[in-house]
Amino acid sequence: MSELNTKTSPATNQAPGPEEKGKAGSAKKTEDEEEEIDIDLTAPETEKAALAIQGKFRRFQKRKKDPSS
């Protein structure tokens, strides 16, 4: 499964320039230290939260499509 990383800009996917080589090494270090969170997708709280998020997103899309309402 692919994950979207919203923390990095598209420019960071390119090869680093001479001044960015030090940054690339430290960025890799923080990614390795990141904690992986295991979410139970069958839990009732998770399903409830997902439905709430989906509902808000649908309302947002509807308002975005028809700003007069």
Curated annotation (Swiss-Prot):
It comes from the Eukaryota. The modification Phosphothreonine is found at T8. Residues 46-69 form the IQ domain. Signal peptide: none annotated. Residues 18-31 have a biased composition (Basic and acidic residues). Residues 1-15 have a biased composition (Polar residues). The keyword Iron does not apply. Residues 1-47 are annotated as: Disordered. Keywords: Phosphoprotein. PANTHER family: IG-LIKE DOMAIN-CONTAINING PROTEIN (PTHR15359), PURKINJE CELL PROTEIN 4-LIKE PROTEIN 1 (PTHR15359:SF5). Belongs to the PCP4 family. This is Purkinje cell protein 4-like protein 1.
